[in-house]
């Protein structure tokens, strides 16, 4: 299953990059990449957050998220700033997916933001892997494809 998940993630990564560039996002910019992690409880999530930090990622504070059916998960992001290159993102996805599998935590995809080539930040220009039609409406969880 892990191999097919990673293959799917590689394909989704290329789709996101293509969509961003087609929409005019700056190909030369450094992008904030947010890898979404979730677990059933805080203690489990904290373990993966500590390990991600040791790997060089910035880790956001844990938040509780209610998903379909009323189930509650603890979530955080492992964040890096890199060029928008599929190979770099693929390597991070594989690294974090392997970590989450070892610690029995969910890897919920990755996201990034539109980078204006003119240097102007536009609020709400986020690409979400769940929303293949463009910008996401979510405040903190951009660009995730499952």
UniProtKB/Swiss-Prot annotation:
Residues 135-146 have a biased composition (Basic and acidic residues). GO terms for cellular component: cytoplasm. It is found in: Cytoplasm. Gene3D superfamilies: RraB-like (3.30.70.970). Residues 110-146 are annotated as: Disordered. Disulfide bonds: none annotated. Residues 115-134 have a biased composition (Acidic residues). Belongs to the RraB family. This is Regulator of ribonuclease activity B. It comes from Sodalis glossinidius (strain morsitans). The gene is rraB.
